């Protein structure tokens, strides 16, 4: 190879493969809350397959398990963190009103 061509070659960096999110021993079940909660966003939405890095079959089973857990009220349909923020702000305003009087 010429010297001029050798300048443009980049060395290939090694990368570490990520472990699969679901091991072979894990059971995808609506009662397995520690497993299911990994695949839900902070807002309570089911994360996409691309984000989860799951196979199609695993994603389908996770989705069904999450929906069953929601129906049985093991999981909330929505995370209502915004309501808590609003309630805190209303308590602050009422506290300020009482101070001013």
Curated annotation (Swiss-Prot):
Spell out the subcellular localization from the entry.
Plastid, Chloroplast
Q: Which Gene3D superfamilies match?
A: Ribosomal protein S18
Q: Which domain of life is it from?
A: Eukaryota
Example GO CC term: the record gives: chloroplast
Q: Which GO MF terms does the UniProt record name? A: small ribosomal subunit rRNA binding; structural constituent of ribosome
List the cysteine pairs that form cystine.
none
Q: Which UniProt keywords apply?
A: Chloroplast, Plastid, Ribonucleoprotein, Ribosomal protein, RNA-binding, rRNA-binding
Would you kindly state one Gene Ontology biological process term found in this protein's UniProt entry? translation
Please name the InterPro entries in this protein's record.
Ribosomal_bS18, Ribosomal_bS18_CS, Ribosomal_bS18_sf
Which Pfam family is an annotated match for this chain, by its short name? Ribosomal_S18
Instruction: Report the sequence similarity comment from the record.
Output: Belongs to the bacterial ribosomal protein bS18 family.
NCBIfam families assigned: S18
> Quaternary structure?
Part of the 30S ribosomal subunit.
Q: What is this protein called?
A: Small ribosomal subunit protein bS18c
Which species does the entry assign this protein to?
A: Gossypium barbadense
């Amino acid at each position: 190879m010429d010297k001029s061509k050798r300048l443009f070659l980049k060395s290939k960096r090694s990368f570490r493969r990520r472990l699969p999110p679901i091991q072979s021993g894990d059971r995808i079940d609506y009662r397995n809350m520690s497993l299911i909660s990994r695949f839900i966003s902070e807002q309570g939405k089911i994360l996409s397959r691309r984000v989860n890095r799951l196979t199609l079959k695993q994603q389908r089973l996770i989705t069904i398990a999450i929906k069953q857990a929601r129906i049985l009220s093991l999981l909330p349909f929505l995370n209502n963190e915004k309501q808590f923020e609003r309630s805190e702000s209303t308590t602050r305003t009422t506290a300020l009103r009482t101070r001013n009087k």
